[in-house]
Amino acid sequence: RNAPYGALLYAVRSNLYKKHPYGRLTIGLDKDLTAADINDFKKFNARYHKPNNATLVVAGDIDVNQTKEMVEKYFADIPSSDDVVRNLPKEDPIEETIRSTWYDPNIQVPALLVGYITPKMNTREARVLSILSTYLSDGKSSVLYKRMVDDNKLALAVQTVNLAQEDYGTYLMLALPLGEITLEKLLSEIDEEIEKVKNELITDRDLEKLQNTLETQFVNRNASIEGIANSLSDYYTFYGDTGLINSELDIYRSITKEEIRDVAKKYLNSNQRVIVDYLPG
């Protein structure tokens, strides 16, 4: 968190999630680490770092029977723990805009941060939101980059991303102002483009470009043995379906312009978000 802009995600999530642990840092705050003793760490390790709570992927040109024997040899003696039961609290929906200010001593340029709670990662809507973020800010031809960085010279950078996780997603928007441009000006520019997406269909050509971009990203991600292994691990751990490595592209290809509009209209509303002025200081 000491890196420039290192706390921006926490600045958003700590305001979005008041009940669910997504509102906390993964390893905790300094006060949490200071308060913990060695027994706390041992208990955590004994509960979570066990074979029945792990996914092992062995990939490559392997002998399957020999590999199974090696796995048995090196892992069979490690005791399992009780099954981990996660009964995490449900987050209340946001019904009015939350405004917050965060100070980062390691930056000189302020940032506008906007966050929304979105569906969990194994839903179709999460994939639609990923396509939407690509449309808005992925590359120099994206609508927000072209408008705010190239044409109007308002921003040094602008980015949107749907950070989908196991229980919820976080749709994050980030913009850095150019010169004396205010954060409110950046917000109004972003909001205008969001309203367009919510009320107008993108073009067939744009949809085709988006699908081609996502297909390229998918192929590149799985172009190596390591990439395939990581994908299989994620699909099994978070989706319970390794077959998605063969079918996920088809899901993205089937997403329509109407779905993009409808999902934006459902989740990206001004009364459902957190706005953070991320300032030097």
Model-derived regions, located:
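A generic secondary-structure signal for well-formed alpha-helical elements
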Residues: 1, 62, 66, 74-82, ...
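M16 family metallopeptidases and their MPP-like homologs
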Residues: 4-31, 53-59, 110-120, 146-254, ...
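Non-catalytic, conformational "gating/processing" segments within enzyme and secreted inhibitor domains
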Residues: 5, 38-74, 272
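His/Glu-based metal-binding/catalytic segments typifying zinc-dependent metallopeptidases
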Residues: 14, 83-141, 174, 251
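Short beta-strand/turn micro-motifs at beta-sheet edges
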Residues: 42-46, 99-102, 157-163
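Proteolytic maturation boundary segments
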Residues: 63-103, 247-281
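Short, conserved charged micro-motifs
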Residues: 64-68, 124, 180-185
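Short, solvent-exposed amphipathic alpha-helical segments in soluble enzyme
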Residues: 72-76, 131, 149-151, 190-191
